[in-house]
Amino acid sequence: MERASCLLLLLLPLVHVSATTPEPCELDDEDFRCVCNFSEPQPDWSEAFQCVSAVEVEIHAGGLNLEPFLKRVDADADPRQYADTVKALRVRRLTVGAAQVPAQLLVGALRVLAYSRLKELTLEDLKITGTMPPLPLEATGLALSSLRLRNVSWATGRSWLAELQQWLKPGLKVLSIAQAHSPAFSCEQVRAFPALTSLDLSDNPGLGERGLMAALCPHKFPAIQNLALRNTGMETPTGVCAALAAAGVQPHSLDLSHNSLRATVNPSAPRCMWSSALNSLNLSFAGLEQVPKGLPAKLRVLDLSCNRLNRAPQPDELPEVDNLTLDGNPFLVPGTALPHEGSMNSGVVPACARSTLSVGVSGTLVLLQGARGFA
């Protein structure tokens, strides 16, 4: 039991337990999902023992600084002595949130989790302090299929992804990075992600097309099939096309929804040829008053819903497309017109206005579905 206690101390720092719940941790009746909210200044961390049998574990640390844990556990201990105990845990999905975490403690937790059957890891609202030590020669990486990061800051700046990557096995399939403090990476340090098929950079409004070029390290994401760029400050489809071409990224599905896109293309900008692999493009909620220039010549799916189109697109304005979605545009709704300049009326169909409330929920939810098929 003492050994298990040490393990949990490494994994502690979950989400949104009801304010009326007297205990910090709650395990459902099926022993499937366990949620802890340690909001007290001096929480009783032992309550987390309830989560030992759960498949999904969420731990929210209430913004506490976890540095005192370094005095209570040996983060440098050889985790192989815990291997059998860790393998017996049922946890497959782990969320850790709202804490200030020393990098040494994070590394200690990752070393222990490397012996677990964990497949999906979410880190959110964390401040990582200090630098991450290099991976020891005898250490094994964490075999994740999905890694999701939201509002995580790193003391190491642009090199954080490369430092974190060394603690992961190369089989990562889904990567989501939202509200990043440094969305650009140190590309010369980042190794390739050979198995990564879904990359979600949504909810980074300051990214922009120049930032996208810096984030898509050339030839480091060779297997990308799904790329989500919701609410990332993109300006034109052509600009995105150029960034993808420069990085050698050829997604099958591209989500540019919830960006304020311009329909016209800069005449001085070179023409960009989209990859023939792209067959699905989402341009919904983009404020478009007309079909933008520079779209791929052929698409299987094109979503132009919830824009500001005041007339049906002409055939010569559209690419060859099998599945076109135009729902929620003013020309389809009687009595809805485009706003005049300075008007308080947004010209947005009411149903679409309600849907924009979900903009904070990024494309991650869709992308993560592909990573849920673990054994």
UniProtKB/Swiss-Prot annotation:
One of its GO terms (biological process) is cellular response to lipopolysaccharide. Glycans are attached at residues 37, 151, 282, 323, 336. Disulfide bonds join 25-36, 34-51, 187-217, 241-272. The keyword ATP-binding does not apply. One of its GO terms (cellular component) is plasma membrane. LRR repeats lie at residues 54-82, 83-118, 119-144, 145-172, 173-196, 197-224, 225-251, 252-278, 279-299, 300-321, 322-349. It holds the Pfam family LRR_6. It is a lipid-anchor; GPI-anchor. This is Monocyte differentiation antigen CD14.
